[in-house]
Amino acid sequence: DFLTAPIPPGAAISSLVGHYERVDWFHAPIDAPENTSICDHFNALGAAGPDESVEVLTRSIGQLAAAMAAAGPTTYVPWQDCALATDDFLVVRLMELAVHADDLAFSVGVKPPKFVPAVLDPVLALLAALANRRHGQEVVLRSLSRHERSSGQASAFGPAETSTPRHAG
């Protein structure tokens, strides 16, 4: 419904990466209410069971083409009280789908789905940009390019890594 909602006067227009500066959960520890409340909310949504979840998904898929056709170039995100370019908003949603598909696969012990490059490439670019904001260029560049120089984790959503890089030699 909100893809076609008007943008309220004075609503901030955020960039793809910049809008994460607005979200409280991005800066909060994983066990903080800002994060646990999201999990609690979606657990409550899923409490009706898998049949209800499949019904909601099927209904949403049926509405998707019309919603996308009616969407303008900018989308207001009411739960963040900001607007994003619709293409950026879609990258955010793709990232959520990819990350949570991996979460689900890991939790039930199966291989995660493989995403086509048109989906995965913008997701990985967003995650790399967010990791850079959290950890800095040196950590991310070394983590992605040189195992022997990596300081360890460079997660886009994890805590900032404080260990010292391993040196070749």
Feature map (PLM): residue ranges:
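Structured surface interface patches that mediate subunit assembly and partner/cofactor docking
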Residues: 4-28, 45-169
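Penicillin-binding protein/beta-lactamase superfamily catalytic region
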Residues: 32-44
